């Protein structure tokens, strides 16, 4: 277990804002020399705090005009069957996030599609055909007013992390 210190937080804020920073630019931005900066980044990666680096793509710019949330109830709640169902969902490219949730549904999916017709085909020929689905409800996003840009770090200062 490690505790995130103020320099860790500065590094996380910087790489979350721009994952393409060179080690020199990162060190300059967070007020450290390059060697300690590099060691801290490696430690944050090893501890699973930094889990990867990727480009953020414009959903509409790559032809994915439909964003939907799908609530799914399954007919069996055994741990093994729920895990198998989740694994089947994870294999679907259109499902970009999947959450096991509490409440009146078992899973919440975030799904992207080219258009409504393509979504309808996916929902009817792929999702609905998965075993154990008892109920499925789709909510379409009309306008994305705020998309994910990173996690807030103001409360992370005393968080303990572990590998």
Where in this protein do the model-derived segments appear?
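A compositional/biophysical signature of low hydrophobicity enriched in polar/charged and small residues
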Residues: 1-163
